[in-house]
Amino acid sequence: RIVDTHHQPVDFANVALLNVSDSSLITGGVTNENGQFVIPCEVKKAIVKVSCVGYKTYCNAYRTGEVGAITLEDATINLQKVVIKGHRKYISRENGKLTLDVQNSNLKNIGKATDVIKYIPGMLYTNGKYEVFGKGEPVIYIDGRKQTNTSGLSLLSSTNVKSVQLITNPGAEYDAETRSVINITTVHHSLDGLSGIVGAEISKHKNLSNNEEVNLNIHKGALDVFLAYQYDNTRSDIRYDVNQFNYEQDTFHEISASEYSDRSRSHDYNVGMNYAINKNHTIGGRYLGSISNYKMLDSPFDYMQTYKNDELLTSTDNKTEESEKERFHNVNLYYIGKLTDNLQLNLDADYVYAQLKHKQQVSETSRIDAVSEITHMQNDQRNRATALKGVFAWNMNKNNRLDFGTDFSKISSWGMSVNEEGKIADDQFKNKETKYAGFATFRLSASKWKGSIGLRYEYIHAINTDQGEVKNKTNYSDLLPSLSLSTMFGRVGMNLDFSSRVSRPSFRQLNNSVSYNNQYHYEQGNIYLKPQYVYDTELSVNYSIFDFKLDYQYIKDYIHPTVVAVSGKPGTVTWMSTNAKDFQQLGAQCVVSPVFGCWRPTLTVGVYKPYFTLSYNGEQLDYNHPYGLFAFQNVVALRNDWLFRCDFFWNIKGHHGIYEQNGYSSFNMMVQKQLLKKKLTITLKAEDLFDSSKLNDVKRVNFVVQNRKVNNFNRCIIASISYNFNSFKDKYNGSGSAEDEINRF
């Protein structure tokens, strides 16, 4: 392993093995991002020569298999006070993967990992959720460990992020439901003692919210113990304006407007350890828990008017009381072992338990006769999963590698929904699913060409029970290939990727539990919902500061929202998910990322053209309007550790499935100052300055057309302060084996 004088890994260093007798070249290689290298060699002793730009060349003789860690010294040249400055490219693409070099850019001091992710070209951030343009919500990993929520991201300082990688066409090694991946690699520290980070944040939307965190790490020799805790108190407000027409038989016209103020309090905690038995074997464990409580505090107004054939049918003032309690527990154990010089084994075991209790009371008072009607709903859902995963990595030779492995999971979800008034039938449901999976990926490198071919097999046995009766019993058997091929033509890089994925319904989409919104509007699961299959092909080309990508997606059994009439209740509908025959879309994206001194702008422009048709009001309707993205992000690093950020995002109008979404935008600014040798960071942000991120969409399906306007009151001011000592790093090495199951919960 090659490291610098600060014990940081040196990547892309050239390693040559020379003959001891005459210093002739035997073979060679290049270090990876962890500073590691594996060079098959038949001689018992050789001279190891290591060279890298910015470091002194290192030479020494070693016996085969006894090299250990090699430290490179910085190469310093005095040029009589002449200062030469260069700017390293911080956005790059290799083998189809887009990488941000955080440590060698101004993003290093941007704040937290949550802020770094926003700077990935093509990344959208709306109402607390990340979305890859044209791909949906990504799965996020930190050092190979799946993140089940954003707590791990918010606890990770950007100073401890080495790089961020976006994979938009994951290979066979990733779970079949993963459509895009964000891999965060952190900076590794080897100092013994106590390290950590403490921080606090306060934000003002319509109401005040606050967040406090502490993260501690104790490292001593081969033992590493970590502890993290975060408290979050979020106040949020939201307004809905809905205009809906129901043309099933008579024409029902619903006009409603509502505004809610709520509070969510959560406690997140993480404790674990790593222990290096020796240089070849490491074990560890982790417990991750979360307790969250949600409560609706106020509803300034909530009214609805319903017309039947243009005659007023009802006019009501509504009052909603709602609360949720959620508990989450995850235990993970892992082993990482180097079995031989060329073979490594990773083992993970997981146990997950989650519980959600939801209570709702809706009071509807008529404006016509002042009669009140109260509806109580109570839902209780529990989820349990056990999972095992094993992965082998076999370096066959210097050009070829084979990764193969298997995983197993058994998950169950059960619960009930109760309506005291008997308006909606009570329900008890239970879903069970057992999964067996295996995969293999062969990677090769020859001259200017690099590639990989992968194959993943998954077998699923699922049983859905409602009211004690088996409603659906299904076996899924899927063989999912993937392919990647990349090359260079001079300074032009090209990459072709293909992947096949499957997206299975969440348990909420499958269960028969009913959510009551009002007397004309219910929401419910669909136990007959089938998985959707995604076939994705990408071609990417990069040159200098330019990166261009073409993408074609074909989705079989496409999952989308639909509406059905409620029997015996004219004008009342239930929204649920269903399958369409297929869905297609063709997209393009261009990223330009130049550097002008202290200013690093990034321009991203993208467009997707969908091809989708459904039945609406007895006729076939096309949902084919293209949608787009325009983003202009700017970071300016000033003297004395001042940082300034100014970003503009514009989501351009178009069809997202059955939704025709109007355009919306956001303009954000940030000022940051670092003190005490960059250990203390003070940040002030202003987000959605022009209050232009309000959502407005229209959905037409079956016999219903609904226009919805949503205001999340995103305009806000945020102030935060954090203090780092010894550059904290959570060094947990487990990857987790239940990522798919946790995501579906």
Please identify what each model-predicted range represents.
Residues 430-433, 471-474, 502-556, 574-587, ...:
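Outer-membrane beta-barrel signature, preferentially recognizing the C-terminal barrel domain
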Residues 65-72, 113-116, 150-151, 166, ...:
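N-terminal periplasmic accessory domains that precede
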Residues 16-18, 49-56, 65-106, 126-127, ...:
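Short, acidic, small-residue-rich periplasmic hinge/interaction motif at the N-terminus
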Residues 21-36:
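Short, acidic Ser/Thr/Gly-rich low-complexity loop/linker segments typical of extracellular
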Residues 385-389, 435-437, 530, 536, ...:
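Outer membrane beta-barrel strand-and-loop segments of large Gram-negative receptors
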Residues 119, 145-171:
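Short acidic/polar hinge/loop motifs at secondary-structure boundaries
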Residues 268-293, 318-467, 488, 492-493, ...:
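Face-selective signature of the C-terminal outer-membrane beta-barrel domain
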Residues 185-200, 239, 243, 255, ...:
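Surface-exposed extracellular loop regions of Gram-negative outer-membrane beta-barrel proteins
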